[in-house]
Amino acid sequence: MIEISTSILSVKKGKESQTFIALEKAKTDYFHIDVMDGKFVEKNTYNIMLEYASYIKRISNLPLDIHLMVEDVNSAIDDFLAVEPNIITFHYEACKDKEEVKQIIKKIKENHCRVGLSVKPETKIEEIYEFLPYIHMCLVMTVEPGKGGQTLLTDMVDKISTLKNYIDKNNIDVDIEADGGINLKTAQAVKEAGANILVSGTAILIAKDYKVIIDELKR
């Protein structure tokens, strides 16, 4: 089953509340919260995303899909655990070594939250294979992290396929989330490669009818 995690990075100012309500009615599966610190990536959305996540938690029962694009992962986890997310995803590249990756996975799990691990386009997917049995989701960035509205990097489709083959071969129970440049033209290739959760923001938010786009992305 394909699920949709709608990124709210490009939500229009002044229309946040009505947009969040409309997305829930349109049957998005998750709200995707893009948390950036201005260091790991250039853009800084940290405070506004914490504010949005807190607000969504008050008005909606839909799960929060927190994507940390930050250098100080531990502090961000502490801040965003307060909004009781369904899953917190952090970047492999934000950790100084593999031991820190293990420690962060443990910390998130100890706080009764699901764990996701993300990789940038230039990171070889094989580098995170050893962590797959201990996480709930692997997020494959299909664009360079840091801003919305980018074009999907087509070679990331092969990366997803490689990951999916490894997961199936080793009978590992882990979701694959694809994030970046996902729209009606690119979604099919990503789904066929093995992604079962699609992050889409711009393609949904510019549509007149969110449900039409979300339903089509799920097919």
Regions found by a protein language model. Name each.
Residues Y46-I66, K107-G116, M156-I176, G180, ...:
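Alpha-helix-loop-beta-strand connector modules within alpha/beta enzyme cores
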Residues S118-M156:
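Histidine/lysine/aspartate-rich catalytic loop segments that bind and position anionic ligands
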